[in-house]
From Swiss-Prot:
InterPro entries: Anth_synth/Amidotransfase, Class_I_gatase-like, GATASE, TrpG/PapA_dom. This is Anthranilate synthase component 2. GO terms for molecular function: anthranilate phosphoribosyltransferase activity; anthranilate synthase activity. L-glutamine binds at G57, P58, G59, Q88, S134, L135. Pfam families: GATase. The gene is trpG. NCBIfam families: trpG_papA. Part of a heterotetrameric complex that catalyzes the two-step biosynthesis of anthranilate, an intermediate in the biosynthesis of L-tryptophan. In the first step, the glutamine-binding beta subunit (TrpG) of anthranilate synthase (AS) provides the glutamine amidotransferase activity which generates ammonia as a substrate that, along with chorismate, is used in the second step, catalyzed by the large alpha subunit of AS (TrpE) to produce anthranilate. In the absence of TrpG, TrpE can synthesize anthranilate directly from chorismate and high concentrations of ammonia.
Amino acid sequence: MANILFLDNFDSFTYNLVDQFRVLGHNVTIYRNDCDLEKLVETALNTPDTILALSPGPGTPSEAGILLPLIERLKNQVPIIGVCLGHQALIQAFGGKVVHAGEVLHGKVSRISHDNEAMFKDLANPMPVARYHSLMGQDLPKEFIVNAEYNGIIMAIRHRDLPICAFQFHPESILTVQGSQLLQQSIEWLLNR
């Protein structure tokens, strides 16, 4: 069981993701992205089996309160999982770019291809997932491996050395086949890295 410190980037999907983590048996504490950075860092460093979860949200990573500074402070110290905006923020925090995806996607199901490694082990391939985004990561930093993609768009990443993973799509959506299993395998991968 993980103690998930969940950074809410003021998104309507937050509680779906929180509920999914709780159904999987994990403790979840929610912090808004305008909370006190120092207190959250201290909590993260002093809580056993901590995983920092970065939620979806509107806008860009730079507009999301303490999101980027929090990643900078904790990226070498606690496991991190990001979804949608959280995924984009991790790419940006390590030196990549966030750009317009060329289309606005809201509840679009796409069949992503993945590497069947780490978080995706033994999952359907291609895997139907729900996409809700207009931005995407680009120029992926060398520290990351692309786990999954769709038509050249990065759909999932994992860090080569650190316990960090992220998804552009929404694993918590009912439209994502095996999303619950993907989240559980991600938590296990993060804790055992």
